[in-house]
Amino acid sequence: RFFFFLIMTILDKVTLQRQDTTKIFIFKEGVFYKAYNEGAFLLKDKNYKVAIKHIKSIENEVLSIGFPISVLEKLKENRQPEEYDNYCSLQSNIVFSLLLYEEWYQNQIANIKREDSKYLEEYTLKDTIKNYPLANKTPIEDFIWVAKLQKLISK
């Protein structure tokens, strides 16, 4: 048992959390502590930044929130903490709703995809400007090109 928890994979962590949604499982990772998926959802009222990572080994996005030990100590107050080797569990103050969790999960992923598309548009715009053959174009062609860029930016 001791050895198993020293080498927990991300699959082990999300499975442990999924099996008991009355608790928030918090895992020590380096100097920070993380809660995954349902655990992050149960702490959503704290407004921590949610990180999303696609994990190839489980072919899915995993949502997590991370925080230092000082935050963990505050979270432990009034939550009946149970300590284990590399993680702890805290009693949740709210009742878990699968429907609300799935809605929150999808919203988090949609928000990241919107941010990624903004970055892609900015990158595409910079790339377009960088690669435009200004020296080989007439002033009228340059004017038309700038007008198209303005239209693209104003969308």
Regions found by a protein language model. Name each.
Residues 4-155:
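Basic, polar low-complexity surface loops/patches
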